Protein backbone atom coordinates (compact mmCIF):
# COMPACT_ATOMS: atom_id res chain seq x y z
CA UNK A 1 0.00 0.00 0.00
CA UNK A 2 2.85 2.39 0.82
CA UNK A 3 4.44 1.78 -2.60
CA UNK A 4 1.14 2.46 -4.37
CA UNK A 5 0.77 5.63 -2.32
CA UNK A 6 4.22 6.75 -3.49
CA UNK A 7 3.09 5.99 -7.05
CA UNK A 8 0.09 8.27 -6.51
CA UNK A 9 2.46 11.12 -5.65
CA UNK A 10 4.17 10.73 -9.01
CA UNK A 11 0.89 10.39 -10.92
CA UNK A 12 -2.29 11.25 -9.03
CA UNK A 13 -4.73 9.53 -6.69
CA UNK A 14 -7.38 8.74 -9.36
CA UNK A 15 -4.76 7.01 -11.51
CA UNK A 16 -3.45 4.99 -8.57
CA UNK A 17 -7.01 4.05 -7.65
CA UNK A 18 -7.88 2.97 -11.18
CA UNK A 19 -4.80 0.79 -11.57
CA UNK A 20 -4.19 -0.53 -8.06
CA UNK A 21 -6.97 0.59 -5.73
CA UNK A 22 -8.90 -2.67 -5.64
CA UNK A 23 -5.70 -4.64 -5.06
CA UNK A 24 -4.87 -2.51 -2.01
CA UNK A 25 -8.47 -2.83 -0.78
CA UNK A 26 -8.37 -6.61 -1.09
CA UNK A 27 -5.08 -6.82 0.80
CA UNK A 28 -6.45 -4.70 3.65
CA UNK A 29 -9.71 -6.67 3.79
CA UNK A 30 -7.70 -9.91 3.80
CA UNK A 31 -6.02 -8.78 7.02
CA UNK A 32 -9.20 -7.40 8.59
CA UNK A 33 -11.04 -10.66 7.85
CA UNK A 34 -8.41 -12.59 9.83
CA UNK A 35 -7.14 -14.54 6.83
CA UNK A 36 -3.50 -13.56 7.23
CA UNK A 37 -1.71 -16.30 9.21
CA UNK A 38 0.24 -13.89 11.41
CA UNK A 39 -1.53 -10.54 11.46
CA UNK A 40 -4.58 -9.83 13.57
CA UNK A 41 -6.55 -6.60 13.87
CA UNK A 42 -7.71 -5.97 17.43
CA UNK A 43 -10.75 -3.98 18.53
CA UNK A 44 -8.50 -0.97 19.20
CA UNK A 45 -7.61 -0.84 15.50
CA UNK A 46 -3.99 -1.90 16.06
CA UNK A 47 -2.49 -4.85 14.21
CA UNK A 48 -0.77 -7.61 16.16
CA UNK A 49 1.73 -10.27 15.09
CA UNK A 50 3.47 -13.25 16.68
CA UNK A 51 7.22 -13.03 16.27
CA UNK A 52 8.25 -15.52 18.94
CA UNK A 53 8.90 -18.52 16.69
CA UNK A 54 10.24 -16.81 13.59
CA UNK A 55 11.24 -13.25 12.65
CA UNK A 56 8.26 -11.31 11.30
CA UNK A 57 9.77 -7.90 10.57
CA UNK A 58 12.69 -6.60 8.53
CA UNK A 59 14.84 -7.19 11.63
CA UNK A 60 15.08 -10.85 10.71
CA UNK A 61 18.30 -12.11 12.33
CA UNK A 62 17.77 -15.69 13.45
CA UNK A 63 19.49 -18.48 15.32
CA UNK A 64 20.41 -21.71 13.52
CA UNK A 65 17.05 -23.20 14.55
CA UNK A 66 15.19 -20.31 12.91
CA UNK A 67 14.04 -18.57 16.08
CA UNK A 68 14.58 -14.81 16.10
CA UNK A 69 17.54 -13.16 17.79
CA UNK A 70 15.29 -10.12 18.27
CA UNK A 71 11.87 -11.63 19.13
CA UNK A 72 9.67 -8.64 18.36
CA UNK A 73 6.07 -9.67 18.94
CA UNK A 74 2.70 -8.11 19.67
CA UNK A 75 2.16 -4.57 18.39
CA UNK A 76 5.20 -3.64 16.26
CA UNK A 77 5.51 0.11 15.83
CA UNK A 78 6.37 0.11 12.11
CA UNK A 79 3.70 -2.48 11.25
CA UNK A 80 1.11 -0.29 12.90
CA UNK A 81 2.41 2.90 11.31
CA UNK A 82 2.15 1.37 7.85
CA UNK A 83 -1.23 -0.18 8.70
CA UNK A 84 -2.83 3.16 9.59
CA UNK A 85 -1.23 4.86 6.61
CA UNK A 86 -2.71 2.19 4.32
CA UNK A 87 -6.18 2.59 5.84
CA UNK A 88 -6.07 6.35 5.40
CA UNK A 89 -4.83 6.01 1.82
CA UNK A 90 -7.77 3.71 1.06
CA UNK A 91 -10.16 6.25 2.55
CA UNK A 92 -8.53 8.94 0.45
CA UNK A 93 -9.12 6.88 -2.69
CA UNK A 94 -12.66 5.71 -1.97
CA UNK A 95 -14.29 8.18 0.45
CA UNK A 96 -16.72 9.48 -2.20
CA UNK A 97 -17.45 6.14 -3.88
CA UNK A 98 -21.04 5.18 -3.00
CA UNK A 99 -20.52 1.64 -4.33
CA UNK A 100 -17.80 1.16 -1.71
CA UNK A 101 -19.77 2.69 1.16
CA UNK A 102 -19.94 -0.40 3.37
CA UNK A 103 -16.23 -1.10 2.97
CA UNK A 104 -15.36 2.56 3.53
CA UNK A 105 -17.39 2.60 6.75
CA UNK A 106 -15.54 -0.48 7.92
CA UNK A 107 -12.12 1.04 7.20
CA UNK A 108 -13.19 4.30 8.83
CA UNK A 109 -14.29 2.53 12.01
CA UNK A 110 -10.95 0.75 12.34
CA UNK A 111 -8.91 3.87 11.58
CA UNK A 112 -10.90 5.88 14.15
CA UNK A 113 -10.24 3.25 16.82
CA UNK A 114 -6.57 3.19 15.86
CA UNK A 115 -6.25 6.97 16.10
CA UNK A 116 -7.47 6.79 19.70
CA UNK A 117 -5.17 3.89 20.60
CA UNK A 118 -1.81 4.50 18.95
CA UNK A 119 -0.31 7.24 21.12
CA UNK A 120 -1.51 5.77 24.46
CA UNK A 121 -0.03 2.41 23.40
CA UNK A 122 3.33 3.48 21.97
CA UNK A 123 4.26 6.96 23.17
CA UNK A 124 6.25 6.94 26.40
CA UNK A 125 7.21 9.63 28.90
CA UNK A 126 10.77 9.75 27.55
CA UNK A 127 9.55 11.26 24.29
CA UNK A 128 9.93 8.35 21.89
CA UNK A 129 7.89 5.34 20.77
CA UNK A 130 8.20 1.85 22.19
CA UNK A 131 9.64 -0.50 19.58
CA UNK A 132 6.90 -3.02 20.29
CA UNK A 133 4.24 -3.63 22.89
CA UNK A 134 3.12 -7.11 23.90
CA UNK A 135 0.38 -7.14 26.52
CA UNK A 136 1.76 -5.34 29.55
CA UNK A 137 5.33 -5.52 28.22
CA UNK A 138 6.73 -2.39 26.56
CA UNK A 139 10.08 -2.65 24.80
CA UNK A 140 12.27 0.32 25.71
CA UNK A 141 14.99 -0.40 23.13
CA UNK A 142 15.62 2.76 21.14
CA UNK A 143 15.39 1.55 17.54
CA UNK A 144 14.72 3.36 14.26
CA UNK A 145 11.41 1.64 13.49
CA UNK A 146 9.59 4.57 15.07
CA UNK A 147 10.83 6.84 12.28
CA UNK A 148 8.30 5.19 9.97
CA UNK A 149 5.51 6.36 12.28
CA UNK A 150 6.56 9.99 11.76
CA UNK A 151 7.71 9.62 8.14
CA UNK A 152 4.55 8.25 6.49
CA UNK A 153 1.90 10.53 5.02
CA UNK A 154 -0.77 9.71 7.60
CA UNK A 155 -0.23 9.48 11.35
CA UNK A 156 -2.45 10.20 14.36
CA UNK A 157 0.49 11.90 16.09
CA UNK A 158 0.30 15.68 16.29
CA UNK A 159 3.17 17.96 15.26
CA UNK A 160 4.45 18.43 18.82
CA UNK A 161 4.61 14.67 19.37
CA UNK A 162 6.30 14.09 16.02
CA UNK A 163 8.89 16.78 16.71
CA UNK A 164 9.73 15.30 20.09
CA UNK A 165 10.14 11.83 18.56
CA UNK A 166 12.23 13.21 15.70
CA UNK A 167 14.47 15.10 18.12
CA UNK A 168 15.01 11.86 20.05
CA UNK A 169 15.89 9.97 16.86
CA UNK A 170 18.30 12.72 15.83
CA UNK A 171 20.03 12.63 19.19
CA UNK A 172 20.23 8.85 19.62
CA UNK A 173 20.29 7.27 16.16
CA UNK A 174 21.41 9.68 13.45
CA UNK A 175 24.82 9.17 11.82
CA UNK A 176 26.29 10.54 8.57
CA UNK A 177 25.51 7.16 6.98
CA UNK A 178 21.93 6.64 8.13
CA UNK A 179 20.07 5.71 11.29
CA UNK A 180 21.51 3.25 13.77
CA UNK A 181 19.52 0.07 14.35
CA UNK A 182 20.00 0.55 18.10
CA UNK A 183 20.96 3.48 20.28
CA UNK A 184 24.40 3.51 21.95
CA UNK A 185 22.49 4.03 25.19
CA UNK A 186 20.45 0.84 24.78
CA UNK A 187 21.48 -2.55 26.14
CA UNK A 188 23.37 -4.70 23.66
CA UNK A 189 24.66 -1.92 21.43
CA UNK A 190 27.34 -3.15 19.03
CA UNK A 191 28.29 -0.81 16.18
CA UNK A 192 30.79 -3.13 14.49
CA UNK A 193 29.56 -5.56 11.83
CA UNK A 194 32.67 -7.75 11.90
CA UNK A 195 33.74 -11.28 12.86
CA UNK A 196 32.52 -14.74 11.93
CA UNK A 197 28.98 -15.33 10.54
CA UNK A 198 27.48 -15.86 14.00
CA UNK A 199 29.06 -12.68 15.36
CA UNK A 200 27.91 -10.68 12.34
CA UNK A 201 24.38 -12.06 12.61
CA UNK A 202 24.18 -10.91 16.24
CA UNK A 203 25.55 -7.48 15.32
CA UNK A 204 23.33 -7.00 12.27
CA UNK A 205 20.59 -5.06 14.08
CA UNK A 206 22.52 -4.04 17.18
CA UNK A 207 23.84 -0.65 16.14
CA UNK A 208 24.85 -0.68 12.48
CA UNK A 209 23.60 2.30 10.44
CA UNK A 210 21.15 1.91 7.53
CA UNK A 211 20.95 4.55 4.79
CA UNK A 212 17.46 3.50 3.63
CA UNK A 213 15.93 4.75 6.87
CA UNK A 214 16.93 8.27 5.84
CA UNK A 215 14.02 8.27 3.43
CA UNK A 216 11.49 8.27 6.25
CA UNK A 217 13.68 10.44 8.47
CA UNK A 218 14.14 13.23 5.92
CA UNK A 219 10.50 13.27 4.90
CA UNK A 220 9.51 13.45 8.57
CA UNK A 221 12.02 16.25 9.12
CA UNK A 222 10.57 18.35 6.31
CA UNK A 223 7.00 17.67 7.49
CA UNK A 224 7.85 18.83 11.01
CA UNK A 225 10.20 21.74 10.29
CA UNK A 226 8.96 22.80 6.87
CA UNK A 227 11.20 24.92 4.65
CA UNK A 228 13.44 25.61 7.62
CA UNK A 229 14.49 21.94 7.70
CA UNK A 230 15.55 21.70 4.08
CA UNK A 231 19.11 22.99 4.55
CA UNK A 232 19.74 20.33 7.21
CA UNK A 233 18.43 17.57 4.93
CA UNK A 234 20.54 18.88 2.08
CA UNK A 235 23.68 18.76 4.23
CA UNK A 236 22.93 15.14 5.15
CA UNK A 237 22.70 14.23 1.47
CA UNK A 238 26.12 15.73 0.70
CA UNK A 239 27.66 13.04 2.89
CA UNK A 240 26.02 10.32 0.81
CA UNK A 241 27.27 11.89 -2.41
CA UNK A 242 30.80 11.65 -0.99
CA UNK A 243 30.20 8.02 -0.02
CA UNK A 244 29.19 7.12 -3.57
CA UNK A 245 32.73 7.91 -4.70
CA UNK A 246 34.10 5.29 -2.28
CA UNK A 247 34.09 1.49 -2.52
CA UNK A 248 31.62 0.47 -5.23
CA UNK A 249 31.48 3.70 -7.24
CA UNK A 250 28.03 5.20 -7.68
CA UNK A 251 26.23 3.13 -5.07
CA UNK A 252 25.90 2.51 -1.32
CA UNK A 253 26.86 -0.42 0.86
CA UNK A 254 24.30 -2.54 2.67
CA UNK A 255 25.12 -1.10 6.09
CA UNK A 256 27.72 0.97 7.93
CA UNK A 257 29.37 0.78 11.32
CA UNK A 258 27.39 2.79 13.87
CA UNK A 259 30.53 4.52 15.19
CA UNK A 260 33.20 6.57 13.35
CA UNK A 261 34.64 6.22 10.79
CA UNK A 262 31.36 4.60 9.67
CA UNK A 263 32.93 1.98 7.40
CA UNK A 264 30.70 0.31 4.80
CA UNK A 265 29.93 -3.37 5.46
CA UNK A 266 27.91 -6.20 3.97
CA UNK A 267 26.94 -6.13 0.30
CA UNK A 268 28.85 -3.53 -1.69
CA UNK A 269 25.61 -2.31 -3.29
CA UNK A 270 22.13 -2.29 -1.75
CA UNK A 271 19.07 -1.25 -3.78
CA UNK A 272 16.92 -0.11 -0.84
CA UNK A 273 19.63 2.30 0.29
CA UNK A 274 20.10 3.77 -3.17
CA UNK A 275 16.35 4.01 -3.77
CA UNK A 276 15.58 5.86 -0.56
CA UNK A 277 18.45 8.32 -0.95
CA UNK A 278 17.18 9.01 -4.47
CA UNK A 279 13.72 9.59 -2.98
CA UNK A 280 15.15 12.23 -0.64
CA UNK A 281 17.08 13.88 -3.47
CA UNK A 282 13.87 14.01 -5.47
CA UNK A 283 12.12 15.63 -2.52
CA UNK A 284 14.82 18.31 -2.41
CA UNK A 285 14.62 18.83 -6.16
CA UNK A 286 10.84 19.21 -6.09
CA UNK A 287 11.18 21.80 -3.34
CA UNK A 288 13.89 23.64 -5.31
CA UNK A 289 16.64 23.21 -2.75
Protein language model features and the residues they cover:
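Aromatic-rich carbohydrate-recognition surfaces in CAZymes
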Residues: 1-52, 57, 76-80, 84, ...
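General structural signal for secondary-structure boundaries
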Residues: 9, 16-19, 60, 126, ...
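Catalytic cores of carbohydrate-active enzymes
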Residues: 32-48, 75, 82-193, 235, ...
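Acidic/His metal-coordination segments adjacent to aromatic residues that form catalytic metal sites
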Residues: 51-75, 135, 193-204, 254-264
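Amphipathic alpha-helical interaction segments
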Residues: 66, 91-92, 115, 200, ...
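Generic long, charged, amphipathic alpha-helical segments
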Residues: 179-214
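Intrinsic disorder at enzyme termini
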Residues: 287-289
Amino acid sequence: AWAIQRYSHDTDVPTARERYGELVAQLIDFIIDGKHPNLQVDDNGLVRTDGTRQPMSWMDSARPDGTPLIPRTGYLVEFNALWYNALMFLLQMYADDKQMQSRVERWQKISDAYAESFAPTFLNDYGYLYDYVNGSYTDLSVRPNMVIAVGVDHTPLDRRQRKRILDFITRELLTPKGLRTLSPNSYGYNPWYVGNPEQREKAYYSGSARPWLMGFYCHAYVKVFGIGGLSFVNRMMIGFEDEMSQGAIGTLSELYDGNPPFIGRGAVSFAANVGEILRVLRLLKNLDV
